[in-house]
Amino acid sequence: MDIRRKIIKSNGFNVPSIIFTPSDIHGAAVIIHGYGGSKEEMLGLAYRVAEIGLKTCVIDLRGHGEHTLNLDEGILQDMEAAIKYCRSFGKVVGIGHSLGGRLALISSSDFAIGISPALNTSFGEETQRILKNVRGYRVREAFSGELWEVMKKLEKVNFDDNTKKSIIYGSRDVPEIISLCNSLKTKNSSVTEIENAMHSDIFTLERTFQSVISKLKDYLSDSKKYDKL
């Protein structure tokens, strides 16, 4: 496994990343963190994804980590820049946590997994307070609360084609996320609950890793069958 840092260059901005390259490549994956996170938080998940043969790119979103831009409504462009870079290695999977899960599910990736995705258009005062106190200090943004303005401007997730989207969430997740994910279960969406997982640790748990890998293997298997038609 080759692991190295790379700056992905795009139109007027650069996306810091860490790339995992397996010896035998069967496609690619882009992995993105949530609000107040960083690419370094997602390295454990990235390694497990790369082990099944996906060249895996973990990035810093604007306003986070080594990214030089402040958080703003162009945040999806960071993920799309990484997807574009990965296209030369085959079909691209998008995997993200929280805000990153929302971005993965609305991105141009061929298949997406949202881990505790922030699908809601609004969150309660208590959730906003916790995010501000626990995660906000890690983010470079023009003003406090910019996250909520960015969230309002992101497009909603289209679940019409459920075969290309999957969701994993925790039984002890953010209340708004639990409620919305439970409602999606009735619409035949691919939704998996991880028992006892919290919003803050779900992307580090072995049960989550196993669920992600299982979903990816199913997707890759179906994709190969489709390619042979």
Labelled PLM ranges:
Residues 1-22:
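N-terminal cap/lid segment of alpha/beta-hydrolase-fold proteins
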Residues 109-229:
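The alpha/beta-hydrolase serine catalytic core
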Residues 36, 60-65, 119, 198-199:
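Alpha/beta-hydrolase active-site loop signature
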Residues 26, 34-37:
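Active-site glycine-rich loops that stabilize anionic/oxyanionic intermediates
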Residues 30-34, 169-170:
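The conserved beta1-alpha1 loop
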Residues 41, 70-87:
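Alpha/beta-hydrolase active-site loop
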Residues 46-66:
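Conserved alpha/beta-hydrolase
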Residues 95-104:
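Gly/Ala-rich beta-loop-alpha elbow adjacent to hydrolase catalytic centers
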